[in-house]
Amino acid sequence: MQESFENSVKNILKIIGEDPNREGLLKTPSRVYKAFKFLTSGYEEDPKEVLNDALFTSSNNEMVLMRNIEFYSLCEHHLLPIIGRVHVAYIPNGKVVGLSKIPRMVNIYARRLQIQEQMTEQIAQALAEVIEPKGVGVVVEARHMCVEMRGVQKINSTTTTSALRGCFIKNADTRREFFSLINSPQETHF
């Protein structure tokens, strides 16, 4: 499979008018293969297993929020980068998940060919199914290089998507608290 991938990269280089045998490009096919292998490594992991591996009983019934989880992904339409951050909140219903598992789950979904809308839904759905909270809120803010580098070429434009479950939909106060917390200034001086 690696050889076929590298040959395809060589062919792309030829098609755009480059010489894949020139010094600067000799190792490019191998580098591109390794880069894509890493950037799509999310297909090799199950995010629900990651979450299930760190569930803990808890009497907490207040919002748990992790914000500014940075990620990068590849747009499934153009294979160009998506760079952004994710805010994830849930209200426990007898269980909490280890905090490190939330960004790990985000990385798993991000390291697949994606569209932002789908990734937002996948994160919310995985949390809802695995920890069965009273509610889940997910907001993703991202820049899309397919918008900035080609087509309309709108540099620094951002896209925001959200997915809400349970009490984040049904309870306006919960929803308002979530959006207020993710939009408040964050200073982390410890």
UniProtKB/Swiss-Prot annotation:
Enzyme Commission number: 3.5.4.16
InterPro entries in the record: GTP-CH-I_C/QueF, GTP-CH-I_N, GTP_CycHdrlase_I, GTP_CycHdrlase_I_CS, GTP_CycHdrlase_I_dom
Gene Ontology cellular-component annotations: cytoplasm
Example of a GO biological process term: tetrahydrobiopterin biosynthetic process
Annotated keywords: GTP-binding, Hydrolase, Metal-binding, Nucleotide-binding, One-carbon metabolism, Zinc
Binding site for Zn(2+): 75, 78, 146
Pathway named in the protein's UniProt entry: Cofactor biosynthesis; 7,8-dihydroneopterin triphosphate biosynthesis; 7,8-dihydroneopterin triphosphate from GTP: step 1/1
GO MF annotations in UniProt: GTP binding; GTP cyclohydrolase I activity; zinc ion binding
Disulfide-linked positions: none
Catalysed reactions, as listed in the record: GTP + H2O = 7,8-dihydroneopterin 3'-triphosphate + formate + H(+)
NCBIfam families from the UniProt entry: folE, PRK09347.1-2, PRK09347.1-3
Sequence similarity: Belongs to the GTP cyclohydrolase I family.
Subunit structure: Toroid-shaped homodecamer, composed of two pentamers of five dimers.
Protein known as: GTP cyclohydrolase 1
